[in-house]
Regions:
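Conserved signature/switch motifs of ABC ATPase nucleotide-binding domains
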Residues: 85, 138-141, 159, 191
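Conserved structural motif at the start of ABC-family nucleotide-binding domains
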Residues: 9, 24-26, 83
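Helix-to-loop junction immediately C-terminal to a conserved catalytic motif
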Residues: 55
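ABC ATPase NBD Q-loop/coupling interface
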Residues: 64-82
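ABC-type ATPase nucleotide-binding domains, specifically the catalytic core motifs of the NBD
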Residues: 108-120, 129
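Conserved ABC ATPase signature
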Residues: 139-143, 147-149
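Catalytic Walker B motif of ABC-type/P-loop ATPase nucleotide-binding domains
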Residues: 164-167
Length: 223
């Protein structure tokens, strides 16, 4: 694997342990601009850990993580903060929404410190794209799980990012909401965004241009 201008994330020999338990061992992975990657594997097998390391949300024990064609690995908090703020968006299993706030208030938090001319317009447009613009004034706890997931997707669409990391984005959804989320991911991919999904959903094999399996702390590409 070579670090070229289209490489957004390059992992070299990444190893991660929880205590004495080996989760990931000598992982090599290259994520290039425009990739739609899906990572499969058993529950507890290291998929979410890998995603968190890619997103600089979790440390690793050895190896190197290099981002956006830089020559040197990510080492300090300043680099990690920059990636999280400017380059990477996250879609978590628990949606990471503030339940006692309205949808509008949650959306405003996402762009509070962004230089966006028409924040209200951006919020409305993103919610409309996800089919939840009518929930603007609703409290998050009043929404169904599917609606919360779609709001979480919309929230990611109002902030600038190059890579979207999604942890089981369709795991708890009915078919209708699942297809809305999948269609949104495809649309983002078609717009040039890089998508990395962790999932048990085999439908992603038909969508992703690269699929990987994590097994016994190792990763291999699926054909």
């Amino acid at each position: 694997m070579q670090n070229d201008v289209d490489t957004q994330i390059l992992m070299k020999n990444i190893t991660k342990k929880y205590g004495e338990h080996l989760i990931l061992e000598n992982i090599d992975l290259q994520i290039r601009k425009g990739d739609f990657i899906c990572i499969f594997g058993k529950s507890g097998g290291g998929k979410s850990t890998l995603l968190n390391i890619i997103g600089t949300l979790e440390n690793y024990d050895s190896g190197d993580l290099i981002s956006f064609s830089k020559l040197n690995p990510i080492r300090d908090a300043k680099d990690r903060d920059y990636l999280r703020r400017e380059k990477i968006a996250y879609l978590f299993q628990n949606f990471a929404l503030v339940e006692n706030m309205t949808v509008e208030e949650n959306m405003k938090l996402a762009i509070k410190y962004r230089k966006v001319k028409d924040k209200a317009g951006c919020i409305t447009s993103a919610l409309r794209a996800m089919g939840v613009s009518d929930k603007l004034k609703s409290k998050v706890f009043e929404l169904s799980g599917g609606e919360q997931q779609r709001v979480a997707m919309a929230r990611n669409m109002v902030k600038p990012f190059d890579i979207l990391l999604a942890d089981e984005p369709t795991g708890s959804l009915d078919y209708e909401n699942k297809m809305i989320v999948i269609d949104s991911l495809i649309r983002l991919s078609n717009e040039g965004k890089t998508i990395v999904v962790v999932s048990h959903d085999n439908d992603f094999k038909q969508i992703a241009n690269k699929s990987y399996l994590i097994e016994s702390a190792s990763i291999r590409e699926m054909r």
